[in-house]
């Protein structure tokens, strides 16, 4: 008999059932004699809060209990909203110290015991990669991350980008979640770039920077970080063309406050979320020679925000702005000015602003307002096309900020592919400062 012989199958089943009909009838009568089942409404509700009498931690080995408490923000002998508890669990998991973070409740007199069970992650990660873009050229990327070095709850990051423009950093952080933590970071960075005047190359500038940062950090939720600290810089700038333009190494001292928040859904071709960075710093020149006449102490304020507006499953409208202002701005040190142009944001300078249609660091000043708009469309699987437009002003005097001569307008079209080695992008651009089209290529993640 085949599965397609429907009539034969039905007939055979009916004959088999009739052969044992008396037994089936007795079974049905027996069930019916029990009467109808009583209906019970399921009206139990999950409470929005619970009283925590005590807390138990299971699975902690290398991570301190203080760190986990700082992430969770739960205290015994107090009420806790379950939404707040879930936020704390997400915050702890996002730290990277744990492979899993789970919780449960045990009944207790007057409330419940909160049981936090964790599985700690690997203590170290090593990585290597390669990156190329039109601004920085090719670089070999090296990365190492170690956890719980010297102190529990600490992280040590070692990064290097070895190439034509070398960058390296060593970063040690004692992260205590929503409790104040402590960090120290050393960065070395050298960069060569053209200096432009009226669209033509005027000079080739070389810079070398050594910087040490000491700061205290507070993590708000799992996406926002507040920092207050000090920077010491040992910075050199010179000309590759003019032998008279070589100022040697000079020292700077900079207290700062910064706030950073990142809720992007992914690092490349993001479709939801917001990223914002704010920094207020006071730059003090420490060297007592020609520099005290050339550069003056400067108070620098800057804020940058980029927002994703999902329009449909495949398209996202992106909007952003950068605003930067400087007091005592006539002679601000080079590395603390606002520099505009190019597409790669991977620089040690706080005030770097990518801009369509301008060549790498083509414009610089100490007062600026810039807006950025783009429409990202996912044309097929991991392929994207993104038209972009940027507009804004940059000047050396606040009175000149909105004059026509300081207005910049750039536009471009980017073609991208989200590959396993990182974003691969080709962008063609133009602007009111360059009559010819400018191309930009990016391959892989940047450091």
Q: Model regions: which residues?
A:
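Outer-membrane beta-barrel and related beta-rich outer-membrane complex signature
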Residues: 194-198, 237-242, 290, 329-339, ...
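Periplasmic polypeptide-binding modules associated with outer-membrane biogenesis and secretion
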Residues: 7-132, 143-145, 157-176, 303-305, ...
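Predominantly the C-terminal beta-signal and adjacent terminal strand-loop region
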Residues: 315, 321-322, 327, 404-406, ...
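C-terminal outer-membrane beta-barrel translocator/porin domains of Gram-negative envelope proteins
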Residues: 125-130, 256-260, 264-379
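Flexible, glycine/charged-enriched surface loops at secondary-structure junctions
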Residues: 23-31, 268, 314-319, 383
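Gram-negative/organellar outer-membrane beta-barrel architecture
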Residues: 83, 88, 94, 100-102, ...
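Transmembrane beta-barrel strands of outer-membrane/channel proteins
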Residues: 128-132, 142, 158-162, 184-190, ...
């Amino acid at each position: 008999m085949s599965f397609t012989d429907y009539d034969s199958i039905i007939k055979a089943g009916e004959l088999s059932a009739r052969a044992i009909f008396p037994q089936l009838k007795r079974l049905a009568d027996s069930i019916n004699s029990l009467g109808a089942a009583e209906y019970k409404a399921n009206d139990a509700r999950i409470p929005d809060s619970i009283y925590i009498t005590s807390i138990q931690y299971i699975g902690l080995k290398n991570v301190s209990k203080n760190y986990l408490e700082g992430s969770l923000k739960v205290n015994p002998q107090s009420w806790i909203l379950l939404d707040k508890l879930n936020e704390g669990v997400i915050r702890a998991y996002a730290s990277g110290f744990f492979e899993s973070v789970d919780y449960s409740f045990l009944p207790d007199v007057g409330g419940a015991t909160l049981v936090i069970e964790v599985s700690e992650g690997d203590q170290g990660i090593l990585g290597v990669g390669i990156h190329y873009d039109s601004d920085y050229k090719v670089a070999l990327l090296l990365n190492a991350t170690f956890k719980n070095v010297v102190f529990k709850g600490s992280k040590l990051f070692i990064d290097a980008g070895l190439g034509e423009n070398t960058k390296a950093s060593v970063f040690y952080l004692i992260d205590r979640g929503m409790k104040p933590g402590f960090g120290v970071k050393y960065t070395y960075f050298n960069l060569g770039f053209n200096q432009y005047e009226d669209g033509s190359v005027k000079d080739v500038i070389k810079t070398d920077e050594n910087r040490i940062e000491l700061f205290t950090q507070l993590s708000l939720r799992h996406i926002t970080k507040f920092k207050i600290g000090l920077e010491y810089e040992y910075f050199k700038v010179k000309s590759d063309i003019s032998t008279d333009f070589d100022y040697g190494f000079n020292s700077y001292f900079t207290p700062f406050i910064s706030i950073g928040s990142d809720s992007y859904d992914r690092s490349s071709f993001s479709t939801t979320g917001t990223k914002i960075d704010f920094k207020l710093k006071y730059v003090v020149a420490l060297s007592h020679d020609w520099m005290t006449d050339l550069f003056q102490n400067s108070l620098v304020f800057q804020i940058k925000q980029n927002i994703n507006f999902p329009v449909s499953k495949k398209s996202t409208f992106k909007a952003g702005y950068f605003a930067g202002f400087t007091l005592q701005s006539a002679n601000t040190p080079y590395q603390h000015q606002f520099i505009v142009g190019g597409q790669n944001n991977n620089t040690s300078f706080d005030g770097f602003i990518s801009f369509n249609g301008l060549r790498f660091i083509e414009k610089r000043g100490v007062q600026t307002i810039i807006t950025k708009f783009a429409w990202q469309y996912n044309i097929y699987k991991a392929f994207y096309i993104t038209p972009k437009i940027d507009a804004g002003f940059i000047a050396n005097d606040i009175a000149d900020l909105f004059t026509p001569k300081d207005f910049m307008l750039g536009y471009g079209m980017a073609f991208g592919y989200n590959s396993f080695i990182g974003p691969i992008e080709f962008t063609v651009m133009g602007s009111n400062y360059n009559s010819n089209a400018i191309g930009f290529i990016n391959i892989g993640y940047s450091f």
